[in-house]
């Protein structure tokens, strides 16, 4: 056991950790990455040891400010370190790595130890990787979904009809929710939309909405806002909804993987936690997104519907075209700007964005009884064209703590580079993967001002020297890096009518 004095360090390592001077570790049974229990007079917390020569002095232990909510302690107070017990779930993770089926107790233990931070990021990564490689059956996924939901707050509603739209993502510029949610809310449908931040895309719905208003809302705030406006657009992590899911997402993000068992559990756990009874799941299909073809999409849709039946949630899935970005704007600020422009003037908005937003809203207008079967999309258009959706969107922004903005008031990256067409021809391909990578290289989603604005879409004719797209960034260095990447990966491809001249064989 070690007795050391606490020193607060403003550092976030993404996991529970303690920092110890290497001199204090010499001659002991404690080594870097050992799991230890740090105890004070008022509680305890588990962390992994990181050693240092200079960050803390001999006799001190560095306590991360990001973890202090777990333990009541004063700086300089003496604490004791001792070895923590090995997590119970380690053998269960190994079992899944071997491709075996986990029982309910094993799944619940893994999720519980994720939330209690007994698992290191390395151990959690092993679990995520094992489900990515070996998958899970529907009973495992159902159990994992329920336990993820149970680890956080559960919101209940007075109304019995509470609906939601969710996209599994993967499509750059997928800002449909900023149109669909206010359309539904304007029709009197209760739609408490909670979203994650970006995992594999350059901007999640929460990242885009955060450009315009506060998205970190507590349960009481969500209830108040929804009671006033019928809807909200909030970040799920701010409400303590399914906290295990957010911890898992933070491990998935660096390697841009989203294992299907986690995808299913993540989506449906949030529906349980927010009291959703009806949901439409958008499954984009195409090159460069999570689902490559319609057969894969139909298979995933069946799993969502089956999981919904197991959880008593009515699920309807739609396969949507995901072969190129939705609309022309990619990146938080650019997407927020395009969404407002589309709400203000839908007739001149990108057709792909309008069609998708109306289609998804229309289904729930029908399920919610606001429209007859087959008439939902028409009603959605009437609400959008009349300006009622814009009015409702602005009301939601205000209730969440923001101020409605005009499109031109949204600040974009001050460092800008236009990419020009090298030849006369037609846009033959826009790579979702390349677009995503370039926008991330420019700084998104952390840099809200970073992104790409497309001037043309697939099939459009261009002339040599025309602007194909514009890259924005809040950093000159990040812009240069993004431009260099764009010149290597060609996010937008232009080809002439003459593909190849062949004179000999």
UniProtKB/Swiss-Prot annotation:
GO terms for biological process: AMP catabolic process; pyrimidine deoxyribonucleoside metabolic process; pyrimidine nucleobase metabolic process. Catalyzes the conversion of AMP and phosphate to adenine and ribose 1,5-bisphosphate (R15P). Exhibits phosphorylase activity toward CMP and UMP in addition to AMP. Functions in an archaeal AMP degradation pathway, together with R15P isomerase and RubisCO. InterPro entries: AMP_phosphorylase (IPR017713), Glycosyl_Trfase_fam3 (IPR000312), Glycosyl_Trfase_fam3_N_dom (IPR017459), Glycosyl_Trfase_fam3_N_dom_sf (IPR036320), Nuc_phospho_transferase (IPR035902), PYNP-like_C_sf (IPR036566), PYNP_C (IPR013102), Pyrmidine_PPase_CS (IPR017872). Its EC number is 2.4.2.57. Keywords: Glycosyltransferase, Transferase. Disulfide bonds: none annotated. NCBIfam families: AMP_phos (TIGR03327), ARCH_P_rylase (TIGR02645), PRK04350.1 (NF003338). GO terms for cellular component: cytosol. Gene3D superfamilies: 1.20.970.50, 2.40.40.20, Nucleoside phosphorylase/phosphoribosyltransferase catalytic domain (3.40.1030.10), Pyrimidine nucleoside phosphorylase-like, C-terminal domain (3.90.1170.30). It comes from Methanococcus maripaludis (strain C7 / ATCC BAA-1331). The active site is at residue 258. Belongs to the thymidine/pyrimidine-nucleoside phosphorylase family. Type 2 subfamily. PANTHER family: THYMIDINE PHOSPHORYLASE. It catalyses: AMP + phosphate = alpha-D-ribose 1,5-bisphosphate + adenine; CMP + phosphate = cytosine + alpha-D-ribose 1,5-bisphosphate; UMP + phosphate = alpha-D-ribose 1,5-bisphosphate + uracil. GO terms for molecular function: 1,4-alpha-oligoglucan phosphorylase activity; AMP binding; pentosyltransferase activity. Pfam families: Glycos_trans_3N (PF02885), Glycos_transf_3 (PF00591), PYNP_C (PF07831). AMP binds at residues 170, 196-201, 205, 266, 290. This is AMP phosphorylase.
